[in-house]
Every structure is written in C-alpha cells, then in structure tokens.
Swiss-Prot record:
Organism, as annotated: Aspergillus clavatus (strain ATCC 1007 / CBS 513.65 / DSM 816 / NCTC 3887 / NRRL 1 / QM 1276 / 107)
Lineage of producing organism: Eukaryota, Fungi, Dikarya, Ascomycota, Pezizomycotina
Protein name in the entry: Cytosolic Fe-S cluster assembly factor nbp35
Gene (name only): nbp35
Binding positions for [4Fe-4S] cluster 2 per the UniProt entry: C257, C260
Region (Disordered): 1-41
Entry note: cofactor: Binds 4 [4Fe-4S] clusters per heterotetramer. Contains two stable clusters in the N-termini of nbp35 and two labile, bridging clusters between subunits of the nbp35-cfd1 heterotetramer.
Binding residues annotated for ATP, in chain numbering: G84, K85, G86, G87, V88, G89, K90, S91
C-alpha cells in the first residue's frame, strides 16, 4: 500500500494545532495565523482577520515535534544542502554527496528530497519507478543500494509528469510527514535536499529538525556573481534562522575534458568566485567541483558518478568535500572515507 497525496496515511496519531478560519486572504506582511503574534502584531492593524486570529485557540508547541525528535533519534548526523539560486547543481550535488558517503560500506545514508514542486532525486538515483510502502512502522524509504535510501514526493505521484501545484501549508505538511512518518531506522547521515531560495520549506525543515539537532548546512554556488548574489542572501538566512553553516561548495568551477583532462573556464569568477566570498563572509570553503559532462549522464541513467568514474577530478573533488564536511561535524575523515575508498 502506498500513501496517497489526497489522504496521507500517518504512522502516528497526534493532535494537531487549531488554525483559525479566516474571512480574507492573509496580507503580505502577515505574521501567520498560527504564530504567537497572530492578531497582535503591527501588521495586523486593519486586517479583516485580526479579531479571528486574536481570539483563536492559544498557540502552543507543535505536538508533532517530540514525535519527529524520537523518530530521528537513531540518525547520527543531519545535513542540509541549500542554494540561493536554482540551476547551480544543488540536487545533483546532494546525490553525489549521498553516493560519496555511501561509498564506504560501513556507512548508512538517507537522502530526503524536500523540493516538493520539483523533485529530481529519484531520477538521479535510478529509482524513479519505485513507490513508497506503508507498514505499522511507518513509510519505508526506497533503497537505492543496501546502505543508501531515498524519500521524495515523486514516489507518490500517480503520473510521474504530474505537476505539484501546492501552496506553502500543504507543502509544509508533507515535509512534516517525511520527517515524522518515514522509518529510516539507524542512519549515519541524513542529507536533506532543499529547493532553491529561502522559502516555506526551509523554515519548516529548520523548525521541525531543530529539537532533534541539525549538524548544519552545505551551501552550493557556481563561480559567477549572479549566483553569489543569492548565496549572500542564503548565508544571511542561515544566520537569522540559527542554522550552522558547514561551508560553501563552488560547483561547476571549470570544465574538465574527459579525453585530455584539460580544464576550461565556463562560468568565469568575475568577482573572485566562491572562495573569496567564503573568506569575506567568514564561513568555511569546502572546495570546488569541476564540471564533468559525465556527471549529467550518470544522473540521467541513475548511476553513481563517484563509483563509475573514480578517477575523474570531479569525483576526487566530491570525496574531498565529504572529508571536509566530516571534519566539520566531528567525524574522522579517514574513517568516513578510508584511504582505500579515496583511492578507488
């Protein structure tokens, strides 16, 4: 039995918060009808919903957070992957990161796709045709390999080409179910792939995971200034939301020819690129990953680029990023990716 998008099947029953019935759309600067400031904030003055929000049931802690915390208690490390702009290869990088961590057979890795409207992880992992199964223990992730599992809304769509046209609250509800109802079991690493920008999904993930502990976020950019412009906003978002920044990764830094291994600059770092930005913003720089056309091919075929092309400069760069991230979260890089795995 697979969960339905119309009537999701929760693995646990828990009381939900009471949301007021509004008589008008929420204005632009609304603090949120379920927030502590609902009906009381300066932005509420003159709003048709002010009396309704102010008199609704007092807001308390989300009752699902303790359930989520308990559910995720067997996961040692939780890592967010963020980007300020779309198209920088964030989801591709998330899949590469997951494969690289899982290249150590002693590690068990989960990859959660929270890009509700643009899920691409199942395609990249080669499990696009799979569906989610539900048991008394919860939703079962789709296992790509023996030690690498994935979860995405794509597994729940009746037609893989169906558009998901949802507003924030419904997307947030599904993300909550991913965290509350998915039976990951014992994991060494849970990598959470997020949509670009600083949207509702990011706020939900941060709020719901805060109690269970998030190790931090890896921010992905490309060298050109148009990407760095939004990365600065992403860094500011992390600092305001209290999310630790593990570091910045510069993706697509140069094109590596598979034939001769020469490197050509495709996206020129007109303002110094990711390394200079990281230094200026006071965050760690985790490394640059060159552009290899075989990365796209591996993702299209749902294969592990790291395993298929271990000698590629891009593979070596990804493994070095994994070692850097491991060090940032308090793990021994030589145990996460032993020398024999690095040499493969």
């Amino acid at each position: 039995m697979a969960p339905s998008l119309v009537e999701p099947v929760p693995a646990f029953d828990a009381p939900s918060k009471v949301a007021p019935n509004l008589v008008a759309p929420e204005p632009e600067h609304c603090p949120g009808p379920e927030s502590e400031q609902a009906g009381k904030g300066d932005a509420c003055a003159g709003c048709p919903n002010q009396a309704i929000c102010a008199s609704s049931t007092p807001k308390g802690p989300d009752p699902d957070i303790p359930i989520i915390t308990e559910r995720l208690s067997q996961i040692r490390h939780k890592i967010l992957v963020l980007s300020g702009k779309g198209g920088v290869g964030k989801s591709t990088f998330s899949s590469l990161l997951a494969h690289a961590f899982a290249s150590n057979p002693e590690s068990t890795v989960g990859l959660c796709d929270t890009d509700i409207c643009g899920p691409s992880i199942p395609k990249m992992m080669g499990v696009e045709a799979e569906t989610i199964h539900v048991s008394n223990a919860g939703w079962s992730p789709v296992w790509v390999t023996d030690n690498l599992g994935a979860m995405s809304i794509q597994f729940m769509l009746p037609n893989r080409d169906d558009a998901v046209i949802w507003r924030g609250p419904k997307k947030n509800g599904l993300i909550k179910q991913f965290l509350k109802d998915v039976d990951w079991g014992e994991l060494d690493y849970l990598i959470v792939d997020t949509p670009p920008g600083t949207s509702d999904e990011h706020l939900s993930v941060n709020t719901l995971l805060k109690e269970s502990g998030v190790d931090g976020a890896v921010i992905v950019t490309t060298p050109q200034e148009v990407s760095l412009l939004d990365v600065r906003k992403e860094i500011d978002f992390c600092r305001k939301a209290g999310i630790r920044i593990l570091g910045l990764v510069e993706n697509m830094r140069g094109f590596v020819c598979p034939g001769c291994s020469n490197t050509s600059e495709i996206f020129r770092a007109t303002t110094g690129g990711g390394k200079r930005l990281a230094k200026k913003m006071g965050i760690p720089f985790l490394g640059s990953v060159p552009l290899d056309p075989r990365v796209g091919m591996a993702c299209d075929y749902g294969e592990s680029f790291v395993d298929s092309y271990p000698d590629s400069p891009a593979s070596m760069a990804i493994k070095q990023v994994v070692r850097s991230v491991s060090q940032m979260i308090g793990e021994d890089p030589d145990k996460v990716l032993p020398p024999d795995v690095m040499a493969e």
